From Swiss-Prot:
Expressed by the skin glands. Transmembrane segments: none annotated. It comes from Xenopus borealis. Its main location: secreted. This is Caerulein precursor fragment B3. Signal peptide: none annotated.
Length: 22
């Protein structure tokens, strides 16, 4: 459902952020 989709995004975003900041 939508909740699991949002959960996946919130787990995925922190992995992207370090590569963006560096």
């Amino acid at each position: 459902g939508l909740g699991s989709l949002l959960g996946s995004l919130f787990k995925f975003i922190p992995k992207l952020l370090p590569s963006i900041q560096q």
